[in-house]
A protein has these predicted regions:
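Asp-based, Mg2+/Mn2+-dependent phosphohydrolase catalytic module
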Residues: 65, 69-84, 96-126, 130-161
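Histidine-centered beta-alpha loop that forms part of the nucleotide-sugar donor binding/catalytic region
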Residues: 16, 53, 149
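Active-site neighborhood of HAD-like aspartate-dependent phosphohydrolases
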Residues: 1-49
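Substrate-recognition element of Asp-dependent hydrolases with the DxDx(T/V) motif
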Residues: 34, 38-71, 87-94, 137
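Metal-dependent phosphoesterase signature
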Residues: 13-32, 57-66, 81, 93, ...
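Active-site flanking residues adjacent to catalytic metal/cofactor-binding acidic residues
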Residues: 7-9, 52, 127-129
Length: 161
């Protein structure tokens, strides 16, 4: 069994919207087979955590409550009875703020290590679709996997089974 899987959200779990933000669950579309992949990954990882930049909150396009509702619906769609994702960390800050939580900085990962002190960094992975995801993961000492439309979360899963 692997330790912790950190997942970015937009572009890894769900389809990114071109030039705008996913602000509610009606706009949220799972990338092909990402939901199935998460269900399988849940069986081979000790925990799954999401780390996602959500500056739409900082821009006033959505609220933290909107985001929480979206994430609750995402969780219930993945499994109606249990949370397959153990915790979701998000940074609401604008990029210009240069805060510590916004990737490529490692604040969300540091918070996860505080919440789950037994995380074994060397046995953990971060899967992301952007350079900022990969930089954050590498700077924190995680194994990193970059996905895109041709190499998805589900494709990666097949390489580790």
């Amino acid at each position: 069994m692997y330790d912790t899987l950190f997942l970015d959200r937009d572009g890894v779990i769900n389809v990114k919207l071109e030039g705008r933000y996913v602000t509610n669950f009606s706009e949220f579309v799972f990338i092909k087979d990402s939901d199935t992949a998460i269900r399988k990954l849940h069986k081979i990882f000790k925990r799954i955590l999401v780390v996602t930049n959500q500056q739409g909150i900082g821009k006033g396009i959505m609220t933290e409550n909107d985001l929480n509702i979206l994430h609750q619906k995402m969780q219930r769609t993945l499994d109606p009875e249990i949370n397959l994702i153990d915790k979701i960390y998000f940074c609401p800050c604008l990029e210009e703020k240069k805060c510590n939580c916004r990737k490529p900085k490692t604040g969300m990962l540091e918070n996860a290590k505080i919440d789950f002190p037994d995380i074994n960094i060397q046995q953990s992975f971060l899967v992301g679709d952007s350079n900022s995801d990969i930089i954050a993961g590498k700077n924190f000492g995680l194994n990193t996997i970059k996905v895109d439309e041709n190499f998805t979360l589900n494709n990666w899963l097949k390489t580790i089974l």
